[in-house]
Amino acid sequence: MLLQGANPRLDVTVPAPLNGLDPEASFVQLRLEPSPVLKPTSTVRVLINDELAGIFLVRDLRQEPVVRVPIPALPPGERFITVSVQPFLSISDDICADLNTGNLLLTVGRDSFFELVPRVPDTTVAGFLRLVYPQLTLVVPANLTPEAAEAALWLYSLLSHLFPQTPILWSNRPVAGAQVTLEPANFTPHLQHEITPEGSRLRVAARRESILALYEEWKRAGLVSRGIQVAAVADLERALRANRLSFRELGIVDPLLRGFGSQSLVFNFNLSQLGGRPRDLAAQLDVIMNPVDGRAGDRLTGYVFLNGVLLRTYNLTGRTQLNETVTLPTRLLRRFNQLELRFDYGASLGNCQGSLTPLTLQVRSDSSGLLWSGYQAPNGELQEIPAVLQGSGRVGLGDPQLLPAAAYLVGALSRLAARPLLPTLEVLPKEEANLETGNFAWQVIVAGPDQVELNSPIRLGSQFEIINPLNQQVALAAQPQENLGLLQYFLLQGKPTLWLSWWGSDPALAERLSRGLADPRTRLANQLQGNVLTAYAAAPNLTQVQSWDLTPQGYRVRYPGRFSWQLLLWQYRYWLVLVLALLLAVGAWNVYQRLAGRPESPIPS
């Protein structure tokens, strides 16, 4: 995290242990790297829950940038720990000149971390979900019943949503480290947390109610017991969202800026939080600030950016409030988006030395947010996944052995979704069949090319090539002896459909592709583009993934030995246009001659 300006601020909040904190063993370790041109007497303050915990000189940080700050005992009932980093940076006695250099910088390193030791180990079910793990394992028994298989799919999807930054493995046997075990449906209690020498264990009965309870109750106070028997739980709430999302609902609570120069507030949101790609979108801004005295020559300017594109500017000199609604062009929207509010405070030359009143500005989270009306129809591009996966869904398995591949894929989508995806699981018939979406709003198919017949971008029934239509160069040729994993996205009867399959004789490549998407360390799921993904085994532990745009504006698919009039028309399109233009010119000339020719004078008799 790069902090810029004379007096920036960084706040990081984490949940406190439920049973209290051991102050003798708990600390936060920070790597603070100042700009080399800063005045040695510049300082960095560290506060914990708004109480001063340490002051560090830039001179000392240059010698040792890593500092360890003890976390004191928390007051009763305190649920969160907030660490604030507040630098006070300068280069000279002229703050205006310092700001103009752009060198008032402090970097908070990526290797900074919290070490939180609970006073008493938290053995509640909620305690398992509150911890941060380097890796989780879902242990699933072999030979599952259809009901247990669906429960395993749901549980993996839910864990991926609750632990979006944690790799989650699928295994059929216990392993060391933190793990979640799917128990038989008659296991009691339905939810149980155990702490063993090998690590934390969460045992979950293979019941619909148990998995729904994990999601619906963990964020409340319902899972504060070591073992829980679930009597009943409501279905996952699917209430229609009002077409407004406040900044508080985005997890941003009344952000505050205080300092000089150029400062920014960044609000991150994704299409899933909006429920899809809106037809129109606007940002409602409610900002309060201390007035900047324009009579003295001070200036305050505000800017609004969406994904790096400047949309609006405001002259805020002398104002104490900004209450505006800014239209956000939907053409600029991506899967993940950034709305940035930037404020430039320029002091007059006469006010640059000595005591200078900083700008203090705050955004009201409840009255600020995003507004939209209606949604665009799906367009068949992976950029809109998983935002368009709304309502009830279905996962169709060609074989029960493909369940891990399906779980990895659904889990990858749940990591990016506003709510976990809990689709119905069905096993497809062995014979080839045409699939219909039925009453489902979307579906995921995991099956071989000889088992389903779908109007997908690539027909897998025969050899195919992906070609560049501009130069006819072959970008990918699927030879009979090769093995590929494929993920294709298209619309079936207007409904989003994902088909995970393979080319060749190795179905394991489909699982390798979905496992790569599910691993948050690869960030593959965040970068989905086009409408087709291909994967091949570049090495035993390396899967090479490539995305393709096979829409009419992108690459083309050619099937050797099969005539394609579309490719023929595209290949000779310029000659066809030239011939058509010549024919039109000849026709126009003939018409002109007939209409413009002079009539012959009659011969007198």
Predicted regions and their residues:
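Solvent-exposed alpha-helical segments and adjacent loops
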Residues: 1-605
